[in-house]
């Protein structure tokens, strides 16, 4: 391992104009209780040795480092204390299932400082007929009628993330959505917030003429996360993008596995 890694470092150092990011890979789950797949004890220790070399090289050479290993290991540890048959991995103990992959994406984006950055955010004071704040979106033509209706044009610069609730992929048994049980993904990365203060009673939210839901003035004052509503036009647009990406993946798989 040491000799091979030294050779890899030599290659990386030779590319002076390239930003190097070392990634500590996901663990081999030795502690998952599965009678059909006995673990290779000690395999994860070897993986951890490689990650230590990566971390040391990153510090020495001022390279970036992202750790997938320890956060995934910690989720497995906590959940297996409740249920020894829990794992974020597939049946081979090394490749993450969909919920594990979603957690990897979360840890990677969080390491880039994206946690807390909203999909979009709109803050309106209806009593003063004012847009108090808008983040990562355009808000125009705010109108508050004497009858209590409020309307405005809204264009977000991002789409909400459509957390998949269907298990997809070869030998995958879990869903992306399950990852939200183990990390604050929605809270940190998937917030499309509409907040309206200065209201009384209940209001029906319509977007592009579609009725979305009804909310109390109290809920609107606290803020509604539109990214959690699957029937908004923007969520449905995001789902279409997701399906296009799934088709791209299927095409790639056909090239890699022609027999499928």
Region annotations inferred by a language model:
Residues 1-260:
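Alpha-helical cap/lid subdomain in secreted, periplasmic
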